[in-house]
Every structure is written in C-alpha cells, then in structure tokens.
Amino acid sequence: MAETLLSFGVEKLWDLLVRESDRFQGVKKQFNELRSDLNKLRCFLEDADAKKHQSAMVSNTVKEVKEIVYDTEDIIETFLRKKQLGRTRGMKKRIKEFACVLPDRRKIAIDMEGLSKRIAKKDKRNMRQTFSNNNESVLVGLEENVKKLVGHLVEVEDSSQVVSITGMGGIGKTTLARQVFNHETVKSHFAQLAWVCVSQQFTRKYVWQTILRKVGPEYIKLEMTEDELQEKLFRLLGTRKALIVLDDIWREEDWDMIEPIFPLGKGWKVLLTSRNEGVALRANPNGFIFKPDCLTPEESWTIFRRIVFPGENTTEYKVDEKMEELGKQMIKHCGGLPLALKVLGGLLVVHFTLDEWKRIYGNIKSHIVGGTSFNDKNMSSVYHILHLSFEELPIYLKHCFLYLAQFPEDFTIDLEKLSYYWAAEGMPRPRYYDGATIRKVGDGYIEELVKRNMVISERDARTRRFETCHLHDIVREVCLKAEEENLIETENSKSPSKPRRLVVKGGDKTDMEGKLKNPKLRSLLFIEELGGYRGFEVWFTRLQLMRVLDLHGVEFGGELPSSIGLLIHLRYLSLYRAKASHLPSSMQNLKMLLYLNLCVQESCYIYIPNFLKEMLELKYLSLPLRMDDKVKLELGNLVNLEKLENFSTEHGGVGDLQFMTRLRALSIYIRGRLNMKTLSSSLSKLRDLENLTICYYPMYAPMSGIEGLVLDCDQLKHLNLRIYMPRLPDEQHFPWHLRNISLAECCLKEDPMPILEKLLQLNEVSLSHQSFCGKRMVCSDGGFPQLQKLDLCGLEEWEEWIVEEGSMPRLHKLTIRNDPKLKELPDGLKFITSLKEVHVILNNWDFKKKLSRGGEDYYKVQHIPLVRFL
C-alpha cells in the first residue's frame, strides 16, 4: 500500500527537481547527485510495489524511504521559498540578507549530501535484494424486508417503540435502515425524522444535539448543557410523533447513555442498527429484531451482474460464459455480503476483457494465500476483496483515498474542503488540472471512488454534484492501514511514531499539545470548535513545514500570532468560526496559499491589512462578514480566484471583480450607494461564473438603480438575490439558462411569477422572508416548463394563489411554510400529476382539516403520494 503511495511521492518530487533545476546555482553538484539518487528510489519502489505482501523487510524499508522522500521535499521547498521571498522584498532588505545567502547555500548543500548518504545506505543494505515472482446499489430482495420494518414502525397495534436491525458488518444494515427512513409511508406517518450516526467514539451530547436539530429546529442556536438537552428532548418527544434512527451502536452501555431522552409510551419510535444483538435486547427485550440473511449465490450473482453490466440489465442479455464462470468464482469470496459484492463489482466494472478478469481473479487468490494483516477470521475473505480493490485503484486515487483515513468514524466530509486539502498537499499533480478548477478535479476523483463503491455519497438535488461523502466502517478499516504506515494520525491514535498529519476533534488539550511537538507535521485539522487556547505562538514557530492548517472554531481572542507568517509552505488556511479581531501583516509571507477562509465568528469585527493582493496563487477566498471600518482591500491581482465569498463594496472596489475571469462562484454584499451599471459591467466579464449571490444592506432599504442590473453571464446557473426592490427586472435581464433562483427580503409588490415563469430552464424557485409582499400570485398555463421544486416561505401578506392548468407540468416537490394569510391551496394542483411531495408548515388547523382525507379540499392533493403537515 505505502509502496505505491511513495512512488507517487517520488514522482511528484522528481517533477519538482526537474522543473526548478535552474534555481539551484551554487549547489549544482549536490543537486545532480540527489536527482540521480532519487532515480534509484523510483526503480526500487517499482520492484517493491509488485511484491509488497510477502516481505516484512520490504515493508520496513519502504517506511524508511518514505521519511527520506518527505525530508527531501521539505528541504527543497524551503530553499526555493526563501529565494522567492528574497526576490519580493525591497532592495535594502535584500542587501541586508545577502550575508545569509552563502550560509543558506552551504546548509542546503550539507542537507542534500546527507540525504544522498541516507539513500546510498538504503541502496547498499536493502535495495539490491530481489523479490520472488508470484503470479498468484444494487439490491436484491430488499422490498419485503423494508415493508416488514415499515409495518412495525407505523402500525398502531405494534407496541414496540424500538425496532432493531442486527448483523455482521457489510451485510446491509445501514442500507436497509436508509430505505425505511426514506419510505413515503414513514415520511407521512412521522412529523419529525432524525438520523444519527453513533460510531464507537460518540459523545452523548453530540447525539442529543443532532436529534434536537431535527425534532426541534427552533432550538438549534441555543447553547445547552447535557441536562438541558435531556429535559428539552424529553418534553419534545413526549408531544411529537418522531422517528429516530440510531445507526451503528456498538455497545449495550452506549444505548444506556442515549436512552434517558425517551419518555415511556409516547409517539416516538427508534430504529437502531448494530453488529451486537445485545444492544437490541438491552433497548427492548421484547421488541422486534430483524436479522438480514447473507445473500444466496443466486442473489449475489444478480447484484454483481447489475453492477458490472449496468446497461445490460435484461434477461435477454448474455454474459460471456468464461467471464460468468470467473465472476461466480470471485463472488464466492464475498461471503454473501452486499458491501463486498458492491466493492468487487466496482473494481471489475472498469475492466472489460477476459484477461483482465483472469488477472484480478489471480490477485484475489494471491491475497487469500499470501495473507494480509487483517485478523478477523469470519470476514477475512471480505477484507481481502476490499484490500485488493484498493490496490487496483490508479495511483492518484490511492493517495486521495488514503487521505480519508484521518477523519473520524462516520464523519461527514465536505467535498469542497477535501478538494483543497488534496490540492494543498499536491496529490493531484499539476498536469491533472489542465485548466480545470480544483473543485472540478476533486469532483472527478470522488466520482471515481463512488463508482468503485469505495466511498459513500449522494448527489445534491440542487447542484447535481457530490457535496459530502463518508466511508463505510469496514472500508475505513482498510483505509486505516495508512495509520500503521505512519502517514496520518487521529487524535485518539495510540501510534508512538511522529505522523505528518493530525486531526483534532475536541479532546484533551494537554495530550494534543504533546502531539504538536512534531516539527515535521504537514497537516493539522480542527474539526470541532476548540475553545480558548493560548499555545499557538509556540506552535506556529515550531511547525514551519505545515501545508494544511484548519483552525475551525479556535479562540485567539485578539490578534492572530504574528508567527503564523513563518508558515511559508501553507497552501490551505482556514479561520472559519475562529475568534480573532486582528490579522498580522506577517501573513503577507503566505504567498503559496490556494485556499484562505477568513470567515471568523460573526460577532467579531476584524482588521485585515492590505496583504491579500500579494497572494497571487489563491483559488478560494472567503472574507469576514464584518470588518473594521478602516479595512480597504485591493483584490484586482487575484486573477486565479475560482470562488470569492462575502465580497463587500464597503471594503473593496467592484472594478476589481472584472479581472477575476476564472470565478465560478461569487457572493457580494452591497453597502451604501453603488452604480448598478458598474456592477453589471464587471459581472459581464466573468464568463465562467456559475453561482452568484447579491445582498444589499441595510435590509428592507430601497436601492436605487436596480433596473440597471443586467446579469449577462454565459454560464450562470444559480442566482440568490437579497435586494429590496418593488419589481423584478424584466426576464431579458436574467440569463436564459438560469436553473435555480432564490429571492429573499425583496419586498416585491408586483407578482414575480409572470417574469420568473418565462425563464424556461428554471429547475428550482425559492421565495422566502418577505420576498413578495403582495396579496395575489398567479402561475399561468405554459409557465415554468422545467420547474421541479418550489418553496414559498415567510410571505406574510400573501393571501391568494392561482395555478392554471398546464403550469409547472414537471413540479416534483412543493413546500408552503409560515405563510399565515394564505387561505387555501390552489385548485390547479390537481392538474400537476408529477407532484410527489407537498409539505405544509402552518399554524392553521382548518387548513390541514380541509386537505386531509374526507376534507373539502382533499381532491386537490389526493393524487400526491406524500402530503405532510407540520
């Protein structure tokens, strides 16, 4: 596993040396020797990669070589970065620093010679050894199981308040629970639904908070102690009909910790999943426990065939006899477990020839004969399949997949951030971008991993892309092999070695401080808010090789330590929700940053010196929502930006935007007077812009010249407007290909529908928070031909809605929320046969009564599968 990863690292380092060879004057001899030695490493790793399973000596050697590669990269980049900083400083400083140049050259010469000696030592002792050749969503039968479980949850006569699914890992417990959770009968029966991934290292407070966000969203922003959470949830679950899914509970005592929020004999139900049947018995000794069976050989073949031949799912299609024979031999090693079948299918779906199948079948047998370090006897064959699937990944995907091991179990990973983590660590090499954005490359990698069933993710309905992902716990065990190889470490890791990456999730600050004494640390991620801590001045001084630094929620109080300017290798820096009031001017040294998030806590007014103009490599920039009045930013130099958030006209010039021609996403906050034609002119230069948000402050204040706003952006698909205006601009002011539009706080006095319905590509429309202040709204025949989702929320003056026959013929989901004066749903809904879901959230009992079965308006919604009242 590490051999391939290292080959990737050596190739990346080789590219760096070739690209920058002209900049090593004064150390040419040592440079050329080092480059020659690296070539030896490449040859060694190619040989080692082929025979990694049979030799402990090879494994140990690879670990030592890995340290050499990392140290080489650190030395080379430090030398190059110092030279670059020298070029960008004034003449006086350059003359003053000239005396340091020769010592720097002597130091790198000595460092290079030391590295060459280390490589030579490896070459002499280990690399000459030879290695012996060794040639060694798709579901079946789920419907009945889902129906059975749904029945136990919704039937009135079933008194079991806890329903359980138990069985070994990979048998499909979570998949089954997810199907039940999303079942239309369940959605219509329960007023609130909550899903919680419990995991081995859960905290009770986290579980309770997650449940509260779903069953009592009005309390989300309230800070509560555990006792307060327990009391609030106990009351809510005593009055509301809710389904809580507790996925992956490990121990009986874990249930005991969570259980106090559930009052006896009320309308709530729990669906839990666990590998441990004892958990189910502890939760409800007399409750219904469902145990999925392993798949039969016939069912296994059906699943496998559907995955590997996705376009040929007909009984008439004939699979090549020899491939079918090989396939049936391979699936025997999956043990009837759906997870293993999906992963094996994901592996073979990208291989099309009989010879490739024979090779993979030989590798499966080789793994089982040769063995790996997995010790679970009951599932050893399954682990071998998963391990082989990893090894069959392309090199670039292996590196990116192993990176996921550092995140906690069941942690939901944000894919935009992950794309930048990968880029900051140089995992996709420069040629992979070839003009594509960092996010697009990351999306492509995730799509590959999803296709191979190595990660779990679902496309977002609005953006049509993967936004988050996570690992199945068994797949994560394969991924965690990386920790043994000293590549990463999580906060709870027991590894005595010094890793290059560290993830911190709350925890003991004393223990964390000990781990931060490692000067070779390259990546530090805080994934929970840490609270007050005063040790960062020392950390920044010590951790000068850092590439990725995510300081989510860290409380600095006042000024960020100036020593952060020493982290000259940083490519990723996030201060999201951190607490700070001043950024130091030393941050101007962070010229290699690709990603910079300065969106600190909203309560903080922060001062930012005018150093952002020097960060020419930036691809992502998120500015604070509140900045000191003295802040003036020049951003016109940031021509590589792909995403700019929270740009304020109070602190920056709109004219700077026209130079950011690579922008895909932009949010603008307009404060004070602004010429709309100037803004439109700048936006017209952004030919690749896909997502635009424009907000005007103060809210509900008239804005002059709004009729001059023309959004002439060729690629614009998503538009969010929070601008006070009595009337929408005419439809020709909007891009014809706009897919989503969201309006809020506009106070439109004229009905916006006659304009919006002429934007023929609209897929989703949201009108919220007083976006419309009129009384009557009409959707006419032929309007909104592509619309699938419509949200009408917080329209306090709206009384009447007319929908003509032929309007919104593809509408799938409708939400009506907090529209207190709306008298009734329109008669025309009965013509929209595509409607699948209607959600009505109103404090109006008569409204619900009329739409319920037997009510006078029931005919309007009787064709809709799911109608929910909250």
Curated annotation (Swiss-Prot):
Known function: Probable disease resistance protein.
Keywords recorded for this protein, A-Z: ATP-binding, Leucine-rich repeat, Nucleotide-binding, Plant defense, Repeat
Sequence ranges assigned to domain NB-ARC in this UniProt record: 123-432
Lineage: Eukaryota, Viridiplantae, Streptophyta, Embryophyta, Tracheophyta
InterPro entries per record: Apaf_helical, LRR_dom_sf, LRR_R13L4/SHOC2-like, NB-ARC, P-loop_NTPase, RX-like_CC, Rx_N, WH-like_DNA-bd_sf
Protein name in the entry: Probable disease resistance protein At1g59620
Protein family: Belongs to the disease resistance NB-LRR family.
Organism of provenance: Arabidopsis thaliana (Mouse-ear cress)
Chain positions of LRR repeats: 543-567, 568-590, 703-726, 735-758, 759-786, 808-833
Free-text note on domains in this protein's UniProt record: The LRR repeats probably act as specificity determinant of pathogen recognition.
Any GO MF annotation of the entry: ADP binding
Binding-site residues, ATP: G167, M168, G169, G170, I171, G172, K173, T174
GO process annotations (BP): defense response to other organism
